[in-house]
């Protein structure tokens, strides 16, 4: 089971980093969890890149090994308080995207698998540090998607109507 979970997380990371680099995926269409992750994590990543632009402009990542070291140091600090939630898990993917974009463009061009190497250490960190929490909180399909998938207007309308009826019933 752990191996299949790691493969699933690795696939999510790989698809996300392909999305960041705008590398066309030649496989089947991404899963719903993958699409939601791309939308949410990329939004977080853009916000981080905008807010920390002056810092990131002077921030250099010379190699995949350097990216791995920086990633592990930052994530260790981020999770030292032991608090895990879906928002923090999304930031792991987003930070992987930031680091990948900071690699020298020549290296990414020469090493077309750079995103695969980054996705490996992102997936390993997620599995080793948040895997149990993910399982306990519904997994990617029942936990993550429900947390971040926007509700349709019709569904929201029905929920609001139900709440209004509940309030009217309580007022009687």
Swiss-Prot record:
Keywords: Apoptosis, Cytoplasm
Any GO CC annotation of this UniProt entry: cytoplasm
SMART domains: BCL
InterPro entries assigned: Bcl-2-like_sf, Bcl-2_BH1-3, Bcl-2_fam, Bcl2-like, Bcl2_BH1_motif_CS, Bcl2_BH2_motif_CS, Bcl2A1
Organ and tissue specificity: Expressed in hemopoietic tissues, including bone marrow, spleen and thymus.
Disulfide bonds: none
UniProt motif (BH1) ranges: 77-97
Induction record: By granulocyte-macrophage colony-stimulating factor and LPS in macrophages.
Cell compartment(s), UniProt: Cytoplasm
Cytoplasm recorded as keyword: yes
UniProt cross-references to PANTHER family, sorted A to Z: BCL-2 RELATED, BCL-2-RELATED PROTEIN A1
Entry function: Retards apoptosis induced by IL-3 deprivation. May function in the response of hemopoietic cells to external signals and in maintaining endothelial survival during infection. Can inhibit apoptosis induced by serum starvation in the mammary epithelial cell line HC11.
Name of the featured protein: Bcl-2-related protein A1
Gene designation per UniProt: Bcl2a1
